[in-house]
């Protein structure tokens, strides 16, 4: 069997010699190719014209399974990695292949495993967890049913129902992805975040990233002040500092966190702006290219980066560029 690794993961496993600014602390693996679904933003979508080795801005070269497993077991890789994450493309056999890969990986390492897949039933979620997977992620991507319908196949309501039922049946083991910048308001996203954490669901927050060959290739990324406010709201909610009910909004834009921004900066520093999701997940340059201001920082921020991030949080009312 062959498997795709993110290019940074391949570096950690000794499968390439590229230079990177930040090593991934999770081994990111992709199973399957060319999804049966047609998400407007995804390089792997059914009708996408993007390169087959892309997921977001990251390239995922393919390797022989034996080479990958040797690299994973190497002490150098084990010293860097904190987690293994399978990104499962929804073709006809990828979920079944993932079960086999989970078994193979567990024979080489004790690192926690998460699987971002599209299980259709509670039984499929249970099967993954019984194999020893720590987290199963069912990606909503969109904060509302309306935004979902504009950008994805299927039903937000049905997917949310399965995610909620799974979180109730398997507490502490469910996660989801949410993408900022698909057209939702800040209030939409914040209320969705609160709902997820009320149900015990871990959230990985992404900035929309236009990929050439996808239906949304011409749409701009969210401006930084918009994304920074959502990151702070996410941090406040997940740490229990305040609830979304305590926030204030004007025309859908977040204007008050229920705690002063000065106090939040003093208490939280750069934490809100680090990559979110499962413990040990840092996703270097998933939404950016090196040299740009980072939406999600893969490592601790410098003093200057912390100040810049909070300055964006304080920025006056704004609009998406180009709107």
Named regions from a protein language model:
Residues 1-27, 51, 109, 191-323:
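Auxiliary Fe-S-binding modules of radical SAM enzymes
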Residues 11-16, 29-36, 40-149, 155-169, ...:
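Conserved Radical SAM active-site core
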Residues 56, 86-89, 177-180, 218-221:
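Conserved short-loop catalytic and cofactor-binding motifs
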Residues 60-63, 151-158, 184, 188, ...:
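Alpha-helix N-cap and loop-to-helix initiation/capping positions
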Residues 64, 97, 101, 124, ...:
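General structural feature for long, well-ordered alpha-helical segments within catalytic domains
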Residues 113, 136, 174-176, 203:
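Hydrophobic/aromatic residues located in beta-strands of well-ordered beta-sheets
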Residues 121-131, 180-198:
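Catalytic cores of alpha/beta
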Residues 163-187, 206-213, 219:
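Conserved strand-turn element in the central/C-terminal portion of the radical SAM core barrel
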């Amino acid at each position: 069997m062959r498997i795709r690794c993110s290019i940074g993961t391949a570096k950690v496993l000794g499968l390439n010699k590229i230079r990177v600014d930040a090593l991934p602390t999770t081994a990111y693996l992709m199973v399957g190719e060319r999804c049966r679904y047609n998400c407007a933003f995804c390089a792997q979508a059914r009708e996408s014209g993007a390169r087959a080795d892309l997921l977001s801005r990251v390239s995922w070269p393919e390797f022989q399974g034996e080479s990958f497993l040797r690299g994973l077991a190497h002490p150098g890789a084990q010293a860097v990695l904190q987690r293994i994450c399978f990104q499962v493309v929804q073709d006809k056999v990828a979920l079944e292949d993932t079960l086999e890969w989970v078994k193979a990986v567990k024979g080489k390492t004790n690192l926690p495993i998460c699987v971002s897949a599209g299980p259709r039933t509670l039984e499929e979620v249970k099967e993954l967890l019984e194999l020893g997977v720590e987290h199963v992620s069912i990606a909503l991507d969109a904060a509302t049913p309306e935004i979902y319908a504009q950008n994805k196949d299927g039903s937000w309501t049905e997917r949310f129902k399965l995610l909620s039922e799974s979180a109730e049946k398997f507490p502490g083991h469910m996660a989801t992805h949410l993408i900022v910048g698909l057209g939702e308001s800040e209030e939409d996203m914040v209320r969705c975040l609160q709902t997820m954490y009320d149900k015990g669901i871990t959230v990985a927050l992404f900035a929309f990233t236009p990929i050439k060959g996808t239906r949304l290739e011409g749409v701009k990324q969210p401006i930084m002040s918009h994304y920074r406010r959502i990151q702070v709201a996410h941090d406040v909610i997940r740490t229990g500092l305040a609830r979304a009910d305590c926030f204030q909004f004007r025309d859908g834009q977040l204007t008050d966190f229920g705690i002063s921004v000065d106090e939040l900066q003093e208490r939280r520093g750069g934490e809100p702006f680090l990559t979110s999701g499962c413990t040990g997940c840092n996703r270097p340059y998933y939404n950016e290219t090196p040299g740009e201001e980072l939406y999600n920082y893969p490592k601790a921020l410098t003093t200057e980066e912390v100040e810049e991030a909070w300055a964006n949080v304080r920025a006056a009312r704004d609009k998406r560029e180009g709107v």
